[in-house]
């Protein structure tokens, strides 16, 4: 009886190890599921961009700042992007203060995303006066617009389709004048060369 299962250290060690492996696998699967949309967005933006920064704060030229989800340089075109992952049927118009999304489990409302884009585009134009700048509000494929949508509002896949290309092995070469403009944008956004997101400001 000295080797009964409840007194067998090897049994408990193997059982504990097996349980740990299962929990780690479940946690990893959950992480993959939760971040799938985010990783898909990131991959798409990297594919279509000659240069890319994300989650930046830019000076607005009058002493304030504006947030920008993503700024994509492609050729001589700069796209100022507001990216939203909203599930369900989306109802919105340019003159509506509040937009609504009807998902499977809940009804979700959010402010009209078009109105803040003017200030964001203006801020980018101040930093890149020689570039053609356009605003786009992009929704992931989890959302759809059963009653139409305003100009400048697209699904991410629709926006990206004409810009998709074979995967690049390294940074895309761009003219020196564009690189200088881009460096100025990155400096204003506190993004180091070769990075996509701003540096965290340390608190002393």
Residue ranges of each PLM-predicted region?
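Surface-exposed interaction regions that form or flank ligand-binding interfaces
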Residues: 1-66, 73-78, 87, 98, ...
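Polar interaction faces of repeat-based domains
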Residues: 90
């Amino acid at each position: 009886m000295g080797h009964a299962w409840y007194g067998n250290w090897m049994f408990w060690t193997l059982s504990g190890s097996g349980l740990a492996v299962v929990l780690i696998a479940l946690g990893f699967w959950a992480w993959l599921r939760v971040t799938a949309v985010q990783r898909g967005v990131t991959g798409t933006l990297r594919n279509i961009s000659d240069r890319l920064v994300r989650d930046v704060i830019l000076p607005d030229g009058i002493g304030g700042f504006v947030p920008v989800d993503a700024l994509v340089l492609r050729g001589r075109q700069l796209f100022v992007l507001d990216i939203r992952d909203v599930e369900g049927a989306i109802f919105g118009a340019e003159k509506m203060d509040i937009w609504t999304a009807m998902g499977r489990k809940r009804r979700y409302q959010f402010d009209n995303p078009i109105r803040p884009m003017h200030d964001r585009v203006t801020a980018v134009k101040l930093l890149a006066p020689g570039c053609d700048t356009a605003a786009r509000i992009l929704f992931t494929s989890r959302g759809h617009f059963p009653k139409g949508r305003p100009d400048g509002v697209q699904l991410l896949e629709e926006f990206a389709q004409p810009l998709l290309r074979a995967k690049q092995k390294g940074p895309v070469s761009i003219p020196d004048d564009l690189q200088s403009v881009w460096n100025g944008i990155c400096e204003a956004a506190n993004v180091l060369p070769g990075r996509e997101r701003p540096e965290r400001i340390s608190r002393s």
